Amino acid sequence: RESYNQRRRFLLHAYEEMGLTCFEPMGAFYTFPNISRFGMTSEEFATRFLEEEKVAVVPGTAFGDCGEGFVRVSYAYSLDNLKEALGRMERFVKRLDGRE
């Protein structure tokens, strides 16, 4: 349980550092960061992130229309894997923001 809490806190902090908002999950081991500021659908974000950085996230729309503007990220992975994935997400977000 503590390892899940540690990983959840790591993701939430990483999102904050990237300027992404995300509600803290209270149950499952998924986060839903808000990606709406990038002006693309959650499907487009997920597809490009997979193609460009080789990291899979689930488009929020897979969970209904209210999921648009969000992607689902699981933290049921090792902290090392999450660090690698979030490093790639940071690089991707910087490109989308025109900072890289």
What is each model feature region?
Residues 1-100:
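PLP-dependent class I/II
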